[in-house]
Amino acid sequence: MGSISPGTGIGHVHLKVADLDRALAFYQGVLGFELTQRFGRSAAFLSAGGYHHHIGLNTWESLGGSPPAAGTTGLYHTAIVYPSRAALAVALRRVLAAKIPLEGAADHGVSESIYLRDPDDNGVELYCDKPKEKWPRAADGELAMYTRRLDLHELLREAPEGTEMESGPRDL
């Protein structure tokens, strides 16, 4: 079996949502994605910049629907990568200001992550990678990822001066 081309990447995720306006309030209003195209009340494309869309939202088969029951197969989470720890801190401030509950926060050795749910109960991971030269490795050179508590107070100190926040981090 052949290998995938090293230039291959994931272009976008397309989510079924129950309420397009509510989903846009989260992805555009809270997380800051740019609306690139909207198709009436049934679909929208959002971008982190420089691309036609990174997230698609639609109600074609899900208008007014409920999230899948726990214990079923499907998408675990969408991971949104930020270019720096400071950018992740700003995203965390926006999430906290919107009073969106956090499900967890972790240092994985290779990255630092914050976990939450969107309004349709889809898992969302907000993260930033650590520099590759700092990734933990075993004696044989293999990655040695781990999961440790991420200090949210320390992370929030990385946000640039003047970044507003209406509430502080919750203890996890």
Region locations from a protein language model:
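Vicinal oxygen chelate
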Residues: 1-4, 9-18, 66-172
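Core segments of cupin and vicinal oxygen chelate
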Residues: 5, 15-61
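Short loop/turn motifs at secondary-structure junctions
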Residues: 9, 32, 74, 101-102
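Short beta-strand/turn micro-motifs at beta-sheet edges
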Residues: 1-2, 63-68
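Residues in well-ordered beta-strands of folded domains
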Residues: 47, 58, 79, 117, ...
